[in-house]
Amino acid sequence: MAKAKFERNKPHCNIGTIGHVDHGKTSLTAAITKVLAETGGATFTAYDQIDKAPEERARGITISTAHVEYETGNRHYAHVDCPGHADYVKNMITGAAQMDGGILVVSAADGPMPQTREHILLARQVGVPALVVFLNKVDMVDDPELLDLVEMEVRELLSSYQFPGDDIPIIKGSALCALEDKNPEIGRDAILKLMEAVDAYIPQPERPLDRPFLMPIEDVFSISGRGTVVTGRIERGEVKVGDEVEIVGLKATSKTTVTGVEMFRKLLDRGEAGDNIGALLRGTKREDVERGQVLAKPGSITPHTKFAAEAYILTKEEGGRHTPFFTNYRPQFYFRTTDVTGVVSLPEGTEMVMPGDNVSMQVELIAPIAMDEGLRFAIREGGRTVGAGVVAKISQ
């Protein structure tokens, strides 16, 4: 059977369901596919198909994630749903499933619970741009005042983590009613209302191509009579012959001009996000550039050594450490293409971090790295991955 061609006639957006265990994330995911299947925007995927998500390995970490896709009148969506709480933590920290927005599912019968908080905090720390709330299981709550109370509680919780709690759309409904074709006003209609809110409220992500040029340097060559060539895969933006670029990280930032772009040994006039290229740099010596630096549009990114991070520490079974670590732990932090040693400081009240924990921590690197908030990294000991993290806030 021929593979269906992926039609790219609508803007694409990546979203996911987050929230406390048993509040109905997977039922909601199934309900969205069921309701949108009526108009041909999805293939109905039943609860048990989503629930037995296959295991994937991202950066050496095992994560179970279910992927479904669907479309509304406005957009094409890739939607991720994880069976277990630990899978969410790993997914959000490693960025294995990039989220342009999230649907926070809260059971109206229980209100916000510990993992509701933790997922909102993670969404804030890893930079999920926007959330929409589905207040699920409203068929189990008879008292409308109670519903209003839960809604208020959710809004306050969102605001306490710097999300615009007063403005975030909260849709009340029942995923189960939608799946069982009961009470359309809280079933099918609520799902359609939710998708309208997702369409309208979650901003369309900027395509990598439209962002300022950045290429992590993987290798450096000297070509006699022509100069120095750096190679790598363009992460974002585009580069043209004649563009001025900065070399950022590890040493003092320097400026140069791209005098040639080649791909597969052919000369091009430009390279764009996703391309593996070689860039010829004017007047740059072979020893001025090294793997681990980046080539970037001038002024678009700066080098830093100190930042706050959110990290997940692998279990022994995942190939991680067998023992806890403490403040002043000194592993290597692997950013893009290179390892840099750094010192970890744990927050007040955290004595130690056990394998399998996720933790907020401060890091100080021994050499500066070009970074933005949201940049992912691996934590390594002698080339072995023992954790994964994301830059939450740059301090210096």
From Swiss-Prot:
Keywords: Cytoplasm, Elongation factor, GTP-binding, Hydrolase, Magnesium, Metal-binding, Nucleotide-binding, Protein biosynthesis
Cross-referenced Pfam families: GTP_EFTU (PF00009), GTP_EFTU_D2 (PF03144), GTP_EFTU_D3 (PF03143)
Stretches for region G2: 60-64
Region (G5): 174-176
GO terms under cellular component: cytosol
Catalytic reactions on record: GTP + H2O = GDP + phosphate + H(+)
GO molecular function, one term: guanosine tetraphosphate binding
Residues the record lists as binding Mg(2+): 26
Spans annotated as G1: 19-26
Chain sites annotated for binding GTP: 19-26, 81-85, 136-139
Stretches the record annotates as G4: 136-139
InterPro entries in the record: EF-Tu_GTP-bd (IPR041709), EF-Tu_GTPase (IPR050055), EFTu-like_2 (IPR004161), EFTU_2 (IPR033720), G_TR_CS (IPR031157), P-loop_NTPase (IPR027417), Small_GTP-bd (IPR005225), T_Tr_GTP-bd_dom (IPR000795)
Region annotation G3: where it falls in the sequence: 81-84
Top-level taxon in the UniProt lineage: Bacteria
Ranges where the tr-type G domain occurs: 10-206
Subcellular location: Cytoplasm
Protein EC: 3.6.5.3
Annotated coiled-coil segments of the chain: none
Main location: cytoplasm
Subunit structure comment from the entry: Monomer.
Family recorded in the similarity comment: Belongs to the TRAFAC class translation factor GTPase superfamily. Classic translation factor GTPase family. EF-Tu/EF-1A subfamily.
PANTHER family (UniProt xref): ELONGATION FACTOR TU, MITOCHONDRIAL (PTHR43721:SF22), ELONGATION FACTOR TU-RELATED (PTHR43721)
NCBIfam families with a match to the protein in the record: EF-Tu (TIGR00485), PRK00049.1 (NF000766), PRK12735.1 (NF009372), PRK12736.1 (NF009373), small_GTP (TIGR00231)
Function text: GTP hydrolase that promotes the GTP-dependent binding of aminoacyl-tRNA to the A-site of ribosomes during protein biosynthesis.
Protein name: Elongation factor Tu
Source organism per UniProt: Granulibacter bethesdensis (strain ATCC BAA-1260 / CGDNIH1)
Lineage: Bacteria, Pseudomonadati, Pseudomonadota, Alphaproteobacteria, Acetobacterales
